[in-house]
Amino acid sequence: MVTAKMVKELRERTGAGMMDCKKALTETDGDMEKAVEFLREKGLAAAAKKAGRVAAEGLVTTYLSEDNKTAVALEVNCETDFVSINESFVEFTNSIAKQIATSDVKDVEELLESKYIADENVTVKEALTALIAKIGENMNIRRFEKLTIDNGVINGYVHGEGRIGVLVELGCEKESDILMPLAKDIAMQVAAANPLFLDETSVDEEALDKEREIYRAQALNEGKPEKIVEKMVEGRVKKYLKEVCLIDQVWVKNSDYTIKKLLEEKSKEVGSPITLCKFVRFERGEGLEKKEENFAEEVQRQMNQK
């Protein structure tokens, strides 16, 4: 059964009209992902809106070691934006990011059982439980990623008071003052342009085949002759790759440059090749469903806690 809530979610994810969303869900027996594909094939949904919508509160933060060789991106979730800017919550999140960077923990489960860096008398799990009791709101250490490099640097960028956090790893045999600002610029690019892949070699073939099928269906629905459909599909695939591969994206600070061209020019300045090794991009609440609440009731609940 197709519900109003399902139609609302599909509209938010695709930007398509209400009746189109209802039809898509009906045609796909209520399967949300298939409904998104259905709308795209009909040309009714933008490819850029395919990713899961952001619907949870919390904080994304980054931590960089003093030598810029180790870095961490971390997401900690909470229920409301009031808590995401709470001083105790922010301090806890920053402490956890530092703890991950300075320890060998491999995942969230191992992290929770380890001694808390700010108070070794308790575990991270116990510290989190105490913070939940103090603030009166559920919290969760959702995910983290740690990067390390020997030859090169790592820099980060946090956007929108912890809404998006990015790390960029640049490899280079020579040390240079150019590297850190360059990594920061590319991190800002990642935050703004949201690339899905580093370059074409890292593109998931299954995902690419899916895009081809969608473009093929779009072309056929437009009434294009079969003989030119394949050319159209490949043209759209090339455009898609330039949009989703970081190395091929147009630089947001100067449209005369792609990221590849920017790296080539900076490599000449440094006198040694600069390699874009990896990037990490966390967006707060990606793929999480936020419980819908009356705003006035939420404010009242926060006031009652004071």
Curated annotation (Swiss-Prot):
Belongs to the EF-Ts family. One of its GO terms (molecular function) is translation elongation factor activity. This is Elongation factor Ts. InterPro entries: EF-Ts_dimer_sf, Transl_elong_EFTs/EF1B, Transl_elong_EFTs/EF1B_dimer, Transl_elong_Ts_CS, UBA-like_sf. CDD domains: UBA_EF-Ts. SUPFAM superfamilies: Elongation factor Ts (EF-Ts), dimerisation domain (SSF54713), UBA-like (SSF46934). It comes from the Bacteria. The keyword Protein biosynthesis applies. It is found in: Cytoplasm. Residues 80-83 are annotated as: Involved in Mg(2+) ion dislocation from EF-Tu. GO terms for cellular component: cytoplasm. Associates with the EF-Tu.GDP complex and induces the exchange of GDP to GTP. It remains bound to the aminoacyl-tRNA.EF-Tu.GTP complex up to the GTP hydrolysis stage on the ribosome. It comes from Clostridium novyi (strain NT). Gene3D superfamilies: 1.10.286.20, DNA helicase RuvA subunit, C-terminal domain, Elongation factor Ts, dimerisation domain. Keywords: Cytoplasm, Elongation factor, Protein biosynthesis.
